[in-house]
Protein backbone atom coordinates (compact mmCIF):
# COMPACT_ATOMS: atom_id res chain seq x y z
CA UNK A 1 0.00 0.00 0.00
CA UNK A 2 1.37 3.36 -0.91
CA UNK A 3 0.24 6.35 1.08
CA UNK A 4 1.68 9.60 -0.13
CA UNK A 5 2.05 12.99 1.47
CA UNK A 6 3.01 16.04 -0.56
CA UNK A 7 6.03 17.88 0.82
CA UNK A 8 7.31 20.72 -1.35
CA UNK A 9 8.00 19.17 -4.75
CA UNK A 10 8.31 15.55 -3.63
CA UNK A 11 6.04 12.86 -2.23
CA UNK A 12 6.73 10.79 0.86
CA UNK A 13 5.39 7.27 0.59
CA UNK A 14 4.69 4.67 3.23
CA UNK A 15 4.64 0.94 2.68
CA UNK A 16 3.58 -1.73 5.12
CA UNK A 17 5.18 -5.10 4.51
CA UNK A 18 5.23 -7.79 7.20
CA UNK A 19 6.03 -11.50 7.43
CA UNK A 20 2.79 -13.44 7.91
CA UNK A 21 2.29 -17.13 8.57
CA UNK A 22 0.30 -18.78 5.76
CA UNK A 23 -1.26 -22.22 6.31
CA UNK A 24 -2.64 -24.60 3.71
CA UNK A 25 -3.46 -28.31 3.54
CA UNK A 26 0.14 -29.15 2.55
CA UNK A 27 2.04 -27.04 5.07
CA UNK A 28 2.81 -23.60 6.38
CA UNK A 29 5.30 -20.86 5.62
CA UNK A 30 6.08 -17.27 6.55
CA UNK A 31 5.84 -14.96 3.54
CA UNK A 32 6.73 -11.28 3.37
CA UNK A 33 3.37 -9.70 2.58
CA UNK A 34 2.72 -6.30 1.07
CA UNK A 35 -0.53 -4.62 2.15
CA UNK A 36 -1.84 -2.83 -0.94
CA UNK A 37 -5.21 -1.08 -0.96
CA UNK A 38 -4.62 -0.32 -4.65
CA UNK A 39 -4.80 -4.02 -5.51
CA UNK A 40 -8.39 -5.25 -5.73
CA UNK A 41 -7.66 -8.85 -4.81
CA UNK A 42 -5.04 -10.73 -2.82
CA UNK A 43 -2.26 -12.50 -4.71
CA UNK A 44 0.57 -14.95 -4.13
CA UNK A 45 3.69 -15.77 -6.13
CA UNK A 46 3.55 -19.26 -7.74
CA UNK A 47 6.88 -20.32 -6.17
CA UNK A 48 5.29 -20.35 -2.71
CA UNK A 49 2.08 -22.22 -3.53
CA UNK A 50 3.45 -25.75 -4.07
CA UNK A 51 4.25 -26.45 -0.41
CA UNK A 52 1.14 -24.71 0.95
CA UNK A 53 -1.93 -25.72 -1.05
CA UNK A 54 -3.07 -27.33 -4.30
CA UNK A 55 -4.03 -24.59 -6.78
CA UNK A 56 -7.52 -24.71 -8.28
CA UNK A 57 -8.00 -23.94 -11.97
CA UNK A 58 -10.20 -20.90 -12.53
CA UNK A 59 -13.26 -21.43 -14.72
CA UNK A 60 -12.03 -18.64 -16.99
CA UNK A 61 -8.60 -17.11 -17.31
CA UNK A 62 -8.38 -13.67 -15.74
CA UNK A 63 -6.34 -10.95 -17.38
CA UNK A 64 -5.06 -8.45 -14.85
CA UNK A 65 -3.93 -4.97 -15.83
CA UNK A 66 -0.45 -3.93 -14.75
CA UNK A 67 1.13 -0.52 -14.23
CA UNK A 68 2.64 -0.76 -17.73
CA UNK A 69 0.28 0.71 -20.30
CA UNK A 70 -1.59 -2.03 -22.16
CA UNK A 71 0.23 -4.85 -20.35
CA UNK A 72 -1.74 -7.70 -18.77
CA UNK A 73 -0.93 -10.87 -16.84
CA UNK A 74 -2.91 -14.07 -17.31
CA UNK A 75 -4.02 -15.72 -14.08
CA UNK A 76 -5.23 -19.32 -14.33
CA UNK A 77 -5.16 -20.57 -10.72
CA UNK A 78 -6.36 -19.61 -7.26
CA UNK A 79 -5.71 -20.97 -3.74
CA UNK A 80 -7.54 -20.59 -0.44
CA UNK A 81 -5.19 -20.04 2.48
CA UNK A 82 -5.38 -19.28 6.17
CA UNK A 83 -3.06 -16.57 7.47
CA UNK A 84 -2.33 -14.96 10.81
CA UNK A 85 -2.11 -11.28 11.72
CA UNK A 86 -1.19 -10.63 15.37
CA UNK A 87 -2.15 -14.24 16.22
CA UNK A 88 -5.64 -13.74 14.74
CA UNK A 89 -6.59 -16.47 12.25
CA UNK A 90 -7.98 -15.12 8.97
CA UNK A 91 -8.65 -16.78 5.63
CA UNK A 92 -9.08 -15.75 2.00
CA UNK A 93 -8.63 -16.59 -1.65
CA UNK A 94 -5.35 -15.68 -3.36
CA UNK A 95 -4.82 -15.42 -7.10
CA UNK A 96 -1.64 -17.25 -8.18
CA UNK A 97 0.08 -14.53 -10.23
CA UNK A 98 3.06 -15.41 -12.44
CA UNK A 99 5.86 -12.85 -12.22
CA UNK A 100 4.50 -11.23 -9.04
CA UNK A 101 7.21 -9.00 -7.56
CA UNK A 102 6.16 -9.78 -3.97
CA UNK A 103 5.85 -13.09 -2.12
CA UNK A 104 2.24 -12.22 -1.29
CA UNK A 105 -0.06 -9.20 -1.47
CA UNK A 106 -3.11 -8.53 0.69
CA UNK A 107 -5.51 -6.48 -1.45
CA UNK A 108 -8.44 -4.19 -0.72
CA UNK A 109 -11.11 -6.92 -0.71
CA UNK A 110 -9.28 -8.81 2.05
CA UNK A 111 -8.57 -5.62 4.00
CA UNK A 112 -12.28 -4.74 3.94
CA UNK A 113 -13.54 -8.28 4.58
CA UNK A 114 -11.53 -8.60 7.81
CA UNK A 115 -11.59 -4.86 8.69
CA UNK A 116 -7.79 -4.72 8.78
CA UNK A 117 -6.44 -1.27 9.59
CA UNK A 118 -3.01 -0.06 8.52
CA UNK A 119 -1.09 2.13 11.00
CA UNK A 120 1.66 3.75 8.93
CA UNK A 121 2.93 5.91 11.77
CA UNK A 122 3.86 2.85 13.84
CA UNK A 123 4.34 0.39 10.93
CA UNK A 124 1.76 -2.02 12.29
CA UNK A 125 -1.42 -3.85 11.39
CA UNK A 126 -4.57 -3.66 13.48
CA UNK A 127 -7.16 -6.41 13.36
CA UNK A 128 -9.98 -6.90 15.85
CA UNK A 129 -9.90 -10.52 17.13
CA UNK A 130 -13.72 -10.48 17.18
CA UNK A 131 -13.86 -10.47 13.35
CA UNK A 132 -12.39 -13.97 13.22
CA UNK A 133 -15.03 -15.55 15.44
CA UNK A 134 -17.32 -17.69 13.33
CA UNK A 135 -21.01 -17.12 13.85
CA UNK A 136 -23.73 -19.45 12.67
CA UNK A 137 -27.16 -17.86 12.73
Segments predicted by a language model, with ranges:
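Aspartyl protease catalytic core from the pepsin/retropepsin fold
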Residues: 12-39, 70-120
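A generic "binding-loop/recognition-motif" signal
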Residues: 39-40, 48
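Short helix/loop capping segments that flank catalytic or ligand/cofactor-binding pockets
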Residues: 43, 114, 135-136
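A compact, surface-exposed functional segment
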Residues: 46-80
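Residue-level signature for short turns and capping positions that connect secondary-structure elements
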Residues: 49, 97, 111, 132-133
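Secondary-structure transition/turn motif
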Residues: 127-136
Amino acid sequence: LLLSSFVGKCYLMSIIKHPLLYVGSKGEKYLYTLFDSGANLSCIHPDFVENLETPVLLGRVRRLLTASEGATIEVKHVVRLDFYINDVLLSDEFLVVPGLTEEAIIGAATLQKWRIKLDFEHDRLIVDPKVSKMQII
